[in-house]
Amino acid sequence: MEYEVIIGLEVHVQLNTNSKIFSTATNEFGGSPNTHISPLCVALPGTLPVLNEVVLEKAVRAGVALGCEITKFTKFDRKNYFYPDLPKGYQISQFDKPYATKGGIHVLLKGEKEEKFIPLTRIHMEEDAGKLIHSHDPSINRSYVDYNRAGTPLIEIVSEPDLRSSDEAYVYLNELKTILRYIQVSDCNMEEGSLRCDANVSIRPKGEKGFRTRVEIKNLNSFKAVKQAIDYEVEWQKDVYSRGESFKQMTKLWDATLLKTIPMRSKEMSHDYRYFPEPDLPTIQISDSFIEDIRKTLPELPRQKKERYKTELGLPEYDAEVLTSEREIAEYFEEALVIAGDAKKTSNWVKDEILGIVNKENISIQEFAIDPVRIGKLVKLINSGEITGKIAKTIFEDMLTTKDQPETIVEKNGLKVVRDDKALEEIVIRVIESQPESVEGWKNGKDRVLGAIVGGVMKETKGKADPKLVNELILAKLGPLGEKKKV
């Protein structure tokens, strides 16, 4: 039987504010256990929450960027459950009045021409819980609680169950991460827990309406893990149905070592959490002017930027994709382009030479040794014909280890293109005379021999000869292809 895969994703994103969502405690990853805490973080009696306005601002910023409808009146609720990393015995979250609804993300699968729109159900704000640290010493059967993370501001972005494959889920997450980093509400660093994802997976026979029993998968600490877990779970559910059996709604953990999902508990429903309005926080009114002020500060988003690169700058799809993959890369490219004046040449240098080093050394483009202004000047020198592409790579190597401007390196090392017709003509004659077999090949109609002669001239001039002038001089000496002309 052929099945259709149904996937919905819940993505938790930590907001990059200076302080936590309801207290003045530092919002910072790492540090010694229980050092970034306040009395509220550990639920000391008498402490009361106060909403951090910057959290609301960044949350709305994310909602606007994702095309959501921002709720004019929103509130917080208590989500009641017991766990050692939740000292209050409840989490402050949002239940029936999330601050943002609808919206969505466009995804484009590799090899596809048409984008697919993945709608969102909602985005809500909530506080993060603490973290359990388990002893690795088998003789010490003990776990410790670090409350540094407790109270960290989160937004939970919930998609509609409209994803139909692990590939779609992977692309969706990448697009979401790119947007959130563009608008600078989070670094989305999965290794530090800034972005965490739960996947809800079910399958149904093709053509069947309605949804079957779903499984929620947790402990997905990379996009690769999300893809692997979904693929495994789909096959597991197919196997269950093929045997004529069924299963209960449940939560599973992804085991990255065994590469399988493992049952954790039966899946709770909303009534299990006994939600009720948070009595210590007032209803929040979000004005139209507040939303519009935020909308005006949004940068050009990656999808729009990519389209502009293709239509206005004439860049290929691949170039536009690479250059807009991170806001910092796009900014580097655009700053270099202002000086260089040639989009394609600038793109080639950024995506091939620069990102090649950035990826190899596992650094960010902000840490790259050469600033965009110097790269722009280098490309401009190539464009003006003052240096060749080959010489540019030599200059680039110097620029990696010095702060010198490219034009300074050119002058200091005498690297300008040779345009002296007489001097070049003498070199051309000398090279032609040293390659009688190439001359014979040309006379016999073999045009590929031209490259050997050009290469000889470039070698003699150490790559400094004007390639266009060299070609003209050689062709003038050789005559038309296939013609038995005396050279």
Curated annotation (Swiss-Prot):
- Signal sequence interval, chain numbering: none
Q: What class of enzyme is it?
A: ligase
One Gene Ontology biological process: glutaminyl-tRNAGln biosynthesis via transamidation
EC numbers: 6.3.5.-
PROSITE patterns for the chain: GATB (PS01234)
An example Gene Ontology molecular-function term: ATP binding
Q: Which reaction does it catalyse?
A: L-glutamyl-tRNA(Gln) + L-glutamine + ATP + H2O = L-glutaminyl-tRNA(Gln) + L-glutamate + ADP + phosphate + H(+); L-aspartyl-tRNA(Asn) + L-glutamine + ATP + H2O = L-asparaginyl-tRNA(Asn) + L-glutamate + ADP + phosphate + 2 H(+)
Keywords, A to Z, come to: ATP-binding, Ligase, Nucleotide-binding, Protein biosynthesis
Subunit details = Heterotrimer of A, B and C subunits.
Q: Which HAMAP family match?
A: GatB (MF_00121)
Q: Which NCBIfam families match?
A: gatB, PRK05477.1-2, PRK05477.1-4
Family, per entry: Belongs to the GatB/GatE family. GatB subfamily.
- Function recorded in the entry: Allows the formation of correctly charged Asn-tRNA(Asn) or Gln-tRNA(Gln) through the transamidation of misacylated Asp-tRNA(Asn) or Glu-tRNA(Gln) in organisms which lack either or both of asparaginyl-tRNA or glutaminyl-tRNA synthetases. The reaction takes place in the presence of glutamine and ATP through an activated phospho-Asp-tRNA(Asn) or phospho-Glu-tRNA(Gln).
Protein name per Swiss-Prot or TrEMBL? Aspartyl/glutamyl-tRNA(Asn/Gln) amidotransferase subunit B
Which species is this record about?
A: Leptospira biflexa serovar Patoc (strain Patoc 1 / ATCC 23582 / Paris)
